[in-house]
Amino acid sequence: MARFLLTLIAATVALVAMVGIEIVLALKREYLATEPALEIGGTFGSASDPPLTFAVLGDSTAAGVGVSRAEHAYATLLAERLAAEGRHVRLLAFGISGARIGDVLREQVPEAIEAEPDLVFVGISANDVIHFTSLDDVRADSSDMVERLRTTGATVVVAGAPDMRAAAWHEPLRSLAGWRGRSVAAAVEEGARAAGATTVPLAERTGPFFARDPEEAYGCDDFHPGAGGYRAWADAIYPELEKALAR
């Protein structure tokens, strides 16, 4: 028994050390620059169609980090699809690289409310995964965020963290990040639904594609989505926007 316990302790220490090394390497890794930011926004569709003000809030992905042209950002792709269904869409993108849910609540939500949007999409919480925001805070901030946005009468759709098993990371960090990401995304969805938002299980819908074809899915840093990844995100998100608007 003593030998077994010593072996177990040694294995645990080795695992913790390995994870620690992977975290250090991940922090030192060079990711895509977030400046200068892409100019995402504008109008889409015919001016004779019914107007729809569409606000997108979130982190670096909402800001289009991972692609070099705004037309490949998921916010733009969603605006184009909404316009294709007979709407004159005004797209407002508030995403800021590095934002956590608390940042969106304090900084982006007030700006979005001033714009009086008809439809809001929030894609958030990858940075909450990385920075270990407590699940209670994630849940509470998600609920508060949706409640405030809905005071404008807007339809609100929310997606939590994507599949966090990024190609940029090695095992066992990759699996641990995936587990943590699922927990955070579930907390986001729980809080958002409680406040009346529609939610998108982004990791579930897009994770298999990112795992199957990382070269097509990721940008050159193997962390942020590239053009193919953002198309997959738009494919996952857009049906929920239409369903929410139809309610």
Predicted regions and their residues:
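N-terminal secretory targeting modules
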Residues: 1-55, 85, 115, 211, ...
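A short helix->loop->beta-strand "cap" motif at the edges of active sites that frequently abuts
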Residues: 152-155
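Generic structural signal for well-ordered alpha-helices
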Residues: 109, 142-146, 185
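Conserved SGNH/GDSL esterase-like catalytic core that processes O-acyl groups on lipids
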Residues: 26-33, 53-55, 61-140
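Alpha/beta-hydrolase-fold catalytic nucleophile elbow
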Residues: 123, 159-160
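Catalytic His-Asp segment of secreted/periplasmic serine-dependent ester chemistry enzymes
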Residues: 164-247
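Residue-level recognition of beta-strand->loop/alpha-helix junctions
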Residues: 93-95, 160, 201-204
